[in-house]
Amino acid sequence: VYKRQQQGTPFIYQGQEIGMTNYPFDSIETFNDVAVKNEYNIVKAQGGDVNALLNKYKMENRDNSRTPMQWDQSTNGGFTNGTPWFPVNPNYKTINVEQQIHDPQSILQFYKDLIQLKNSDEVYTYGQFNLVDEDNPNLFAYTRKLNNKKVLVVGNLTDQVSKLNVPYLIENEQQVMLHNYSSHVIDFDKIQPYEAFVIKV
């Protein structure tokens, strides 16, 4: 939310819009990433901790972004009837486009709403950018202003409840444009874990 309302061209990498997750790597044999295999062989030859290396690369490797797109519950997630270069993530039966496309509460629908909001008003493209509460380490917050239009974009980057110090904005009437929590009530004193929203101020 807080990235896509900034200047520049937003992009979505395949699978991001349905919340595809990292592949469950369990051994070096499950990796195709050449850089991972090369470093593994070097560390192993030097008698290093290959288990620690594998744990690191479960999260930090290129293969996580190379798994087949998960379209539906069919073989290979509907990506191909052939043999894909990399196996489909085993969770494809629960995380796929078909499961989400008609669900108004899905990640896919949220991305659609996010794109629609970005395209709905030039304030999100050309509006002046100003940081808000910039010394707050837990929140990333800013306003975009164009002519007489102004929006506030906030994202809580932590798993902790945080407070946003914007008294001059709280006094004004707000219209919630997008919110990743089911409640559209914004409490500036209690920004919930990973809460993100866009409001007109």
How does the language model describe each region?
Residues 19-20, 159:
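Short, glycine/acidic-enriched loop or turn micro-motifs at the edges of active sites
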Residues 9-12, 25-28, 33-201:
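Carbohydrate-interacting/catalytic domains
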